[in-house]
Amino acid sequence: LYVCINCNYHFRMSAENRIKMFFEDGDYNEIIPDKISDDPLKFTDKKKYKDRLKEYRKKTNRDDAFILIKGKIKDKEIISGLMNFEFMGGSMGRAVGGAIVKGAKIAIENKLPYVIVTSSGGARMQEGIVSLMQMPRTIAAVDLLNENNIPYIVVLTEPTTGGVTASFAMLGLSLIHISEPTRPNN
Protein backbone atom coordinates (compact mmCIF):
# COMPACT_ATOMS: atom_id res chain seq x y z
CA LEU A 1 0.00 0.00 0.00
CA TYR A 2 2.76 2.44 -0.90
CA VAL A 3 4.55 2.20 2.46
CA CYS A 4 8.22 1.29 2.70
CA ILE A 5 8.59 -1.89 4.78
CA ASN A 6 12.03 -0.77 6.03
CA CYS A 7 11.46 2.83 7.11
CA ASN A 8 7.64 3.22 7.10
CA TYR A 9 7.88 6.03 4.53
CA HIS A 10 4.47 6.73 2.95
CA PHE A 11 4.68 7.29 -0.78
CA ARG A 12 2.11 9.45 -2.52
CA MET A 13 -0.59 7.38 -4.21
CA SER A 14 -2.14 8.55 -7.47
CA ALA A 15 -5.88 9.11 -7.75
CA GLU A 16 -6.05 6.30 -10.31
CA ASN A 17 -4.44 3.84 -7.88
CA ARG A 18 -6.74 4.96 -5.07
CA ILE A 19 -9.72 4.22 -7.31
CA LYS A 20 -8.39 0.70 -7.92
CA MET A 21 -7.83 0.25 -4.18
CA PHE A 22 -11.25 1.63 -3.14
CA PHE A 23 -13.21 -0.22 -5.78
CA GLU A 24 -11.11 -3.37 -5.96
CA ASP A 25 -13.90 -5.30 -7.68
CA GLY A 26 -14.05 -2.65 -10.41
CA ASP A 27 -17.67 -1.97 -9.47
CA TYR A 28 -17.88 1.76 -10.21
CA ASN A 29 -18.82 4.31 -12.84
CA GLU A 30 -17.34 7.73 -13.28
CA ILE A 31 -19.76 10.62 -13.21
CA ILE A 32 -18.92 13.30 -15.73
CA PRO A 33 -18.92 16.75 -14.10
CA ASP A 34 -20.68 19.61 -15.83
CA LYS A 35 -18.59 21.36 -18.48
CA ILE A 36 -17.57 24.92 -17.72
CA SER A 37 -15.74 27.50 -19.78
CA ASP A 38 -12.00 27.67 -19.20
CA ASP A 39 -10.11 30.72 -18.01
CA PRO A 40 -12.79 33.23 -16.99
CA LEU A 41 -10.08 35.77 -16.03
CA LYS A 42 -7.86 35.31 -19.13
CA PHE A 43 -5.01 34.63 -16.70
CA THR A 44 -1.39 34.54 -17.86
CA ASP A 45 1.79 34.05 -15.87
CA LYS A 46 4.68 32.31 -17.63
CA LYS A 47 2.06 30.76 -19.91
CA LYS A 48 -1.63 31.18 -20.57
CA TYR A 49 -3.94 29.38 -18.16
CA LYS A 50 -5.73 27.78 -21.14
CA ASP A 51 -2.41 26.37 -22.33
CA ARG A 52 -1.58 25.11 -18.83
CA LEU A 53 -4.97 23.36 -18.66
CA LYS A 54 -4.33 21.72 -22.06
CA GLU A 55 -0.93 20.53 -20.84
CA TYR A 56 -2.35 18.93 -17.68
CA ARG A 57 -5.30 17.42 -19.54
CA LYS A 58 -2.90 15.73 -21.91
CA LYS A 59 -0.56 14.65 -19.09
CA THR A 60 -3.31 13.17 -16.86
CA ASN A 61 -5.98 12.26 -19.42
CA ARG A 62 -8.44 14.10 -17.13
CA ASP A 63 -10.42 17.32 -17.58
CA ASP A 64 -9.56 18.63 -14.12
CA ALA A 65 -8.36 17.76 -10.62
CA PHE A 66 -11.46 15.95 -9.28
CA ILE A 67 -12.76 12.50 -10.18
CA LEU A 68 -16.39 11.84 -9.28
CA ILE A 69 -17.56 8.23 -8.94
CA LYS A 70 -20.61 6.19 -8.05
CA GLY A 71 -19.53 2.73 -6.97
CA LYS A 72 -19.69 -0.10 -4.49
CA ILE A 73 -17.33 -1.01 -1.68
CA LYS A 74 -18.17 -4.43 -0.23
CA ASP A 75 -21.66 -4.23 -1.80
CA LYS A 76 -22.34 -0.80 -0.25
CA GLU A 77 -23.05 1.90 -2.81
CA ILE A 78 -21.38 5.29 -2.32
CA ILE A 79 -20.61 8.51 -4.11
CA SER A 80 -16.90 9.25 -4.03
CA GLY A 81 -14.76 12.17 -5.10
CA LEU A 82 -11.01 11.91 -5.41
CA MET A 83 -8.72 14.86 -5.84
CA ASN A 84 -6.01 14.31 -8.44
CA PHE A 85 -2.75 15.90 -7.26
CA GLU A 86 -1.16 15.22 -10.64
CA PHE A 87 -3.51 17.82 -12.17
CA MET A 88 -2.12 21.22 -11.15
CA GLY A 89 -1.39 20.06 -7.62
CA GLY A 90 -5.00 19.05 -7.07
CA SER A 91 -5.88 22.74 -6.85
CA MET A 92 -9.52 23.74 -6.43
CA GLY A 93 -11.02 25.93 -9.13
CA ARG A 94 -14.52 26.24 -10.57
CA ALA A 95 -14.50 22.77 -12.11
CA VAL A 96 -13.44 21.08 -8.87
CA GLY A 97 -15.92 23.10 -6.81
CA GLY A 98 -18.70 22.28 -9.26
CA ALA A 99 -17.87 18.57 -9.19
CA ILE A 100 -17.88 18.50 -5.38
CA VAL A 101 -21.30 20.20 -5.34
CA LYS A 102 -22.61 17.82 -8.02
CA GLY A 103 -21.42 14.84 -5.96
CA ALA A 104 -23.25 16.16 -2.90
CA LYS A 105 -26.47 16.61 -4.89
CA ILE A 106 -26.25 13.06 -6.26
CA ALA A 107 -25.54 11.68 -2.78
CA ILE A 108 -28.62 13.49 -1.42
CA GLU A 109 -30.87 12.43 -4.32
CA ASN A 110 -29.83 8.78 -3.94
CA LYS A 111 -29.43 8.82 -0.14
CA LEU A 112 -25.86 7.52 -0.44
CA PRO A 113 -22.79 8.28 1.67
CA TYR A 114 -20.34 10.76 0.16
CA VAL A 115 -16.63 9.94 0.57
CA ILE A 116 -14.06 12.51 -0.52
CA VAL A 117 -10.32 11.83 -0.72
CA THR A 118 -8.37 15.08 -0.57
CA SER A 119 -4.96 15.73 -2.09
CA SER A 120 -4.54 19.38 -2.87
CA GLY A 121 -2.26 22.36 -2.72
CA GLY A 122 -5.30 24.59 -2.14
CA ALA A 123 -7.19 27.11 -4.24
CA ARG A 124 -6.15 27.52 -7.88
CA MET A 125 -4.36 30.85 -8.17
CA GLN A 126 -4.99 31.14 -11.92
CA GLU A 127 -8.71 31.56 -11.17
CA GLY A 128 -8.25 34.22 -8.48
CA ILE A 129 -11.39 35.14 -6.54
CA VAL A 130 -13.41 32.70 -8.65
CA SER A 131 -11.37 29.90 -7.09
CA LEU A 132 -11.85 31.29 -3.60
CA MET A 133 -15.61 31.36 -4.18
CA GLN A 134 -15.50 27.56 -4.30
CA MET A 135 -14.81 27.49 -0.57
CA PRO A 136 -18.30 28.71 0.48
CA ARG A 137 -19.90 26.69 -2.35
CA THR A 138 -18.39 23.45 -1.09
CA ILE A 139 -19.15 24.33 2.54
CA ALA A 140 -22.81 24.88 1.60
CA ALA A 141 -22.86 21.52 -0.21
CA VAL A 142 -21.51 19.71 2.85
CA ASP A 143 -24.03 21.55 5.02
CA LEU A 144 -26.81 20.20 2.76
CA LEU A 145 -25.46 16.69 3.25
CA ASN A 146 -25.69 17.17 7.00
CA GLU A 147 -29.21 18.64 6.80
CA ASN A 148 -30.28 15.55 4.84
CA ASN A 149 -28.52 13.12 7.22
CA ILE A 150 -26.21 11.87 4.49
CA PRO A 151 -22.97 10.36 5.85
CA TYR A 152 -19.97 12.44 4.78
CA ILE A 153 -16.48 10.99 5.14
CA VAL A 154 -13.24 12.81 4.36
CA VAL A 155 -9.98 10.94 3.81
CA LEU A 156 -7.16 13.46 4.24
CA THR A 157 -4.05 12.54 2.29
CA GLU A 158 -0.74 14.27 1.98
CA PRO A 159 -0.79 17.04 0.95
CA THR A 160 -4.06 18.73 1.87
CA THR A 161 -3.57 22.45 2.37
CA GLY A 162 -4.98 25.92 1.82
CA GLY A 163 -8.54 26.54 0.69
CA VAL A 164 -9.36 22.84 0.59
CA THR A 165 -8.38 22.47 4.25
CA ALA A 166 -10.27 25.65 5.14
CA SER A 167 -13.47 24.53 3.43
CA PHE A 168 -15.00 21.12 2.76
CA ALA A 169 -12.12 19.04 4.16
CA MET A 170 -11.77 20.22 7.76
CA LEU A 171 -14.53 22.47 9.03
CA GLY A 172 -15.96 19.94 11.42
CA LEU A 173 -18.94 19.33 9.16
CA SER A 174 -18.00 15.78 8.26
CA LEU A 175 -19.06 12.83 10.32
CA ILE A 176 -15.74 11.03 9.94
CA HIS A 177 -12.21 12.24 9.19
CA ILE A 178 -9.54 9.71 8.26
CA SER A 179 -5.98 10.93 7.87
CA GLU A 180 -2.87 9.39 6.40
CA PRO A 181 0.45 10.21 8.05
CA THR A 182 2.30 13.13 6.51
CA ARG A 183 5.55 12.48 4.73
CA PRO A 184 8.66 13.69 6.56
CA ASN A 185 10.69 16.46 4.95
CA ASN A 186 13.78 15.16 3.23
Each language-model region and where it sits:
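Single conserved hydrophobic/aromatic residue that forms the stacking wall/gate
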Residues: 176-186
